[in-house]
């Protein structure tokens, strides 16, 4: 291989290595984002379930008279 082609070959190798690392990083980030979205979805469902339970508990709670003084008065 001529001397003038050596730097080009080295540059090409460096670019290929760099792309390989970038591909690995992209895959890792994609997996992380996917896991985070799954966790967000699960937490959103959990919050909705808690909200529904709270609404149900509030609707089943006995209504307090509006003008009644608290017992400590």
UniProtKB/Swiss-Prot annotation:
InterPro entries: SlyX (IPR007236). Residues 54-73 are annotated as: Disordered. Coiled coil: none annotated. Gene3D superfamilies: 1.20.5.300. Residues 57-67 have a biased composition (Low complexity). Belongs to the SlyX family. This is Protein SlyX homolog. It comes from Rhodopseudomonas palustris (strain BisA53). The gene is slyX.
């Amino acid at each position: 291989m001529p001397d003038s082609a050596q730097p080009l070959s080295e540059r090409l190798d460096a670019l290929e290595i760099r792309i390989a690392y970038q591909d690995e990083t992209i895959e890792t980030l994609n997996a992380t984002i996917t896991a985070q979205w799954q966790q967000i979805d699960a937490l959103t469902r959990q919050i909705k379930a808690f909200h529904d339970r709270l609404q149900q508990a509030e609707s089943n709670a006995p209504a307090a008279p509006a003008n009644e003084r608290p017992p400590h008065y």
